């Protein structure tokens, strides 16, 4: 133990920015919304001081520049936004969270460091999975008078502290909490589900590439905890998307890893499917029964209303109403009599906020990022599993965003920059076929298919 502490001290002296990056990835999802960003800002200052001392310049890469273009346009929308404070503060939040992507791209410049980042992300998700499981089990046992109220782990974990902080802010912040659905350290079950959905494919990558039996067992347990954490949220879309992610990875990796993938699938389906059935009250009666069908109807009403709005307003159609979901909430409330804060769909939300221009900028960014993963020559099983597990995390994250707004808070937004930073680092570390046009993209895609079939 003393030797490990001594090695850690030496590591911090030689590379403090890297140590801060690991701490940020572990702590950011676990701390309150109003604390986590400051951990990131402090870590970035340490990183920048280290880089300046070593006379090195921080790079942002092509993906980083494209993100800066998107965020620059979002900031520019303050000029025509009817809620300029909300627009400016939301854009500023994106610029702040972008610092994580910069840190990952500059600090994770080796394959071992990429694995260390993935292990840290998984460890953080496991903690949230345990908390979420305890919350939902405590609620259920208390509901049937098996344990007293004082023995129930409150959900969200920082519920009391959140209420104190938000009531003392100079501006209003309201959050809707659910006692019958676990939220972990987040303020909402959907936010916890986002964390679990992203970590699920990463835990599979670690399980498939574990070198020892002990590592294999730990990675398997990590996947079980993440699945349990996702199940505890009773989030239908998150559970279904996670299962779809497993199916996709099985199709890609079954030639070499079909036994391991089925080993992972058994506990996954054992805890996730009952969650979906419980939400609809099919196998168990919980406080959230009846809300599921109402929620689906409400989502369709929201989407229909906002599409009607942008099609009826030319300026909103092309350049949007301004970044930030405050104006979206106003439109829904005062024009369509729907008391909802956002679109519950990131594509429609950004269409309302930033118009067709914003959708195009974001679409190019995401397609380019997927292309950078596709460039990598996956000529061995480790690279194949890494590329497709990170790609699956990105797809699941965006897929979940089709039923909920996934950029609603710092702790949810940070996952976008985590995945983009990982994409940049993986692209930097591994051999690739450079994509310059549609022909090279097609050639790279064919190579990926051949590599997949030959594994």
Label each residue range with its predicted role:
Residues 1-89, 106-119, 151-158, 209-217, ...:
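Transmembrane signal-anchor hairpin modules in multi-pass inner-membrane enzymes, especially those
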Residues 24-25, 44, 99, 115-253, ...:
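Alpha-helical transmembrane segments of multi-pass inner-membrane proteins
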Residues 72, 130, 136-141, 233, ...:
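A membrane-periplasm/extracellular boundary helix in multi-pass inner-membrane enzymes
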Residues 177-180, 283-284, 290-354:
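Long extracytoplasmic/lumenal interhelical loops at the membrane interface
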Residues 17-25, 68, 218-224, 373-403, ...:
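Loop-to-helix entry and N-terminal half of a specific, functionally important transmembrane alpha helix
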Residues 51-55, 207, 211-218, 244-246, ...:
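Hydrophobic transmembrane alpha-helices and their immediate junctions
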Residues 45-55, 100-102, 242-264:
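Perimembrane helix-loop-helix junctions
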Residues 184, 188, 227, 338-373, ...:
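A conserved mid-to-late transmembrane alpha helix and its immediate loop/hinge
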């Amino acid at each position: 133990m003393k030797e490990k502490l001594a090695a850690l001290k030496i590591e911090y002296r030689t590379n403090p920015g890297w140590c801060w990056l690991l701490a940020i990835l572990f702590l950011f999802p676990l701390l309150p919304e109003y604390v986590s960003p400051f951990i990131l800002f402090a870590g970035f200052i340490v990183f920048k001081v280290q880089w300046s001392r070593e006379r090195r310049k921080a790079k942002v890469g092509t993906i980083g520049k494209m993100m800066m273009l998107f965020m620059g346009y979002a900031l520019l929308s303050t000029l025509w936004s009817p809620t300029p404070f909300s627009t400016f503060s939301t854009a500023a939040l994106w610029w702040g969270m972008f610092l994580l992507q910069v840190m990952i791209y500059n600090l994770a410049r080796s394959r071992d460091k990429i694995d260390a980042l993935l292990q840290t992300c998984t460890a953080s998700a496991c903690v949230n999975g345990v908390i979420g499981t305890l919350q939902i089990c405590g609620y259920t046992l208390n509901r049937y008078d098996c344990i007293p109220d004082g023995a129930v782990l409150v959900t969200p974990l920082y519920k009391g502290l959140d209420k104190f902080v938000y009531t003392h802010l100079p501006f209003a912040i309201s959050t809707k909490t659910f006692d019958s659905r676990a939220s972990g350290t987040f303020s909402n079950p959907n936010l916890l589900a986002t964390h679990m959905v992203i970590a699920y494919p990463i835990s599979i990558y670690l399980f498939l590439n574990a070198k020892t039996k002990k590592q294999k067992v730990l990675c398997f347990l990590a996947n079980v905890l993440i699945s349990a954490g996702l199940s505890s949220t009773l989030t239908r879309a998150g559970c279904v998307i996670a299962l779809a992610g497993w199916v996709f990875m099985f199709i890609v990796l079954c030639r070499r890893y079909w036994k391991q993938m089925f080993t992972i699938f058994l506990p996954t389906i054992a805890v996730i499917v009952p969650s979906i059935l419980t939400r609809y009250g099919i196998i168990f009666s919980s406080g959230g029964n009846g809300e599921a069908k109402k929620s689906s109807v409400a989502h369709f009403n929201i989407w229909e209303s906002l599409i009607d709005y942008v099609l009826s307003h030319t300026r909103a159609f092309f350049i949007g109403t301004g970044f930030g979901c405050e104006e979206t909430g106003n439109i829904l409330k005062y024009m369509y009599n729907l008391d909802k804060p956002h679109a519950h769909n990131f594509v429609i939300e950004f269409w309302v906020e930033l118009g067709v221009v914003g959708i195009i900028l974001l679409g190019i960014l995401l397609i380019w990022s997927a292309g950078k993963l596709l460039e990598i020559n996956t000529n061995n099983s480790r690279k194949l599993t890494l590329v497709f597990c990170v790609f699956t995390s990105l797809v699941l994250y965006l897929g979940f965003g089709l039923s909920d707004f996934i950029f609603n808070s710092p702790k949810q937004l940070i996952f976008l920059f985590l995945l983009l930073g990982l994409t940049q680092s993986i692209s930097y570390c591994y051999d690739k076929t450079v994509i310059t046009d549609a022909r090279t993209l097609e050639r790279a895609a064919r190579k990926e298919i051949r590599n997949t079939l030959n594994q």
